[in-house]
Amino acid sequence: MIRIEPYSDKEVKSVLTNLMNNQEFMKFIKSNLNKSTSKFLSIPGSSLMVMQLFKSKIKNINSVKEFQDQVKLVLKSVVDQTIEEFQTKGLDNLESNKPYLFIGNHRDITLDSALCNFALDSIGQDTTFNAIGDNLVSVDWMGDLLRLNKSFVISRSGASKKEIYTNLLKASEFIKNKLDGGNHVWIAQKQGRSKDGIDKTDPAVLKMLHIALRKTCDFQEITNYYNIVPCSISYEIDPLAVEKSQQLQNTKSKDLDEDISHIFKGVMLNKGRVKLCFADQIQGAYSPESLAH
């Protein structure tokens, strides 16, 4: 069974220690130090120095917050170096101390939720717990990194309908538990990225959210229990436009590690201007289909 929950503070140190001893992870980090965009990294021996600095920082991390503090520094650098202008709209409408369920469009595997958190942090809001697919934890070290960063897994696979339902129930209960505890949650509006640029919410995602509430309320009352806020992000330049086009045209088969390479390419390459908009909180009674539209 796939673990759904992210890591807790008490697990952080041991997980990071295992990562530092994971040769596959360390090799990937070293091979992805971008010499083409850094004059320092073009100096002989500089990559080794960066790796030692990386390891020393990791040793001082003892909690999820401390890990996210380091992620925040990296993300700030990504925004400064790969985004020409980052605009937000609707942040002023978010109330403090109110747990929101953000349902977002999905263009980039990790940046959509990361930039949502970047925006929330800028106004003093807590970061979200982020929903990810089980495909992203198929490589152990990537699963570790994502779980350290408050990601939880929604598994839609299973040997039987009962197993699939059980997995979705666990995810729904996790989301309910976090929202009830005063935490924000981010989830994509549908499974997989919008490779064709069409953003459309899948009613199945909304039905999954209601599973944990089925004994409490009808679906039409879900907006009385969850503070649902749609959010939408747009990238002027998509670093993975070619790859998405190839997948749409079935001209390129998907490799096992393709998601990982797409994550790093999406993070490291130029994105031009980026805009993130938060809509008003949804009120009223809806069916899954009407809420999706």
For the regions a language model picked out, list residue spans one by one.
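Membrane-anchoring hydrophobic helices of lipid-metabolizing enzymes
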Residues: 1-100, 106-117, 121, 143, ...
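Soluble catalytic domains of membrane acyltransferases
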Residues: 74, 78-282
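Long, compositionally biased intrinsically disordered regions
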Residues: 288-293
